[in-house]
């Protein structure tokens, strides 16, 4: 009996020790000495910066939403970001966040593909996610979008809203990604007005508001009355030029189509009731970032996977701000949206555009 009692007592002690040990191992230390078991997340911006009113800002809003929902504080052991002033900062910033032991680190933008690949190799115990590119590594989740689908819809809106039949597209840097915006947009215009002309210009960067303004000025002077920009912070220059023209002549039809976020507020002409934002192609980076971060915090990080979001996944679309679209245009956009969700393939390259037939 005594031996049995001693054995039972020892078993209880061992069991208790095991439980305590497991608790101790699951606790993640934070610099503030509080917040055990907290998941930390951070991001590195592209050169457009965290306030670009576009995809960098949208990604940060997704991280902030996750942080606030989970009681995290901005900074180390919570949620944070580092801004890149040039592409030379990408690797340095990613490495800095990795050294600070963030659980998940985002690289925002396809230009960070090489840097994410390099740091992911060096930091195999850290999870990374890249937006708008594919990095085939077990500790990297690749997040991509069908930008051509949302761009097609705003192309339909542009073609049906334009009075001149001359439409513009301003891109940041010419690349495979931005061509998806351009080609999808042109396909949408072509689908409803084959006679419309789309003038295409690239600014050579996503942080060149002055170039965006000058490009818009040239386009509007040539008779273009709607410009779709896919240019990050460069697009603020397009808005500036449109607002200046509208302020000079309130009766003039001059429109901008925003990108990534609902940019209706960006089109407000100061001191008036006028707004030059026709609509926006929203790319729901914020929602996707929050969702992927939640999966990672739940132990379901999609490492090694490529996640693609289109209209059917509610990853892209047309903005809810439709004050400047007529009822007929909205109905047409909705009709084409249904066609795409039902299987209409929207072109993403010049080659695909040449053989595209709207149904």
UniProtKB/Swiss-Prot annotation:
Superkingdom, natural source: Bacteria
Protein name per its UniProtKB record: ABC transporter guanosine-binding protein NupN
First-listed, main subcellular location of the protein, grouped into a coarse class: membrane
Lipidation, S-diacylglycerol cysteine type: 23
Family, as annotated: Belongs to the BMP lipoprotein family.
Source organism: Bacillus subtilis (strain 168)
Pfam families linked: Bmp
Deletion consequences: A null mutation does not lead to any detectable defect in guanosine uptake. However, in the nupG-nupN double mutant, guanosine uptake is reduced to an almost undetectable level.
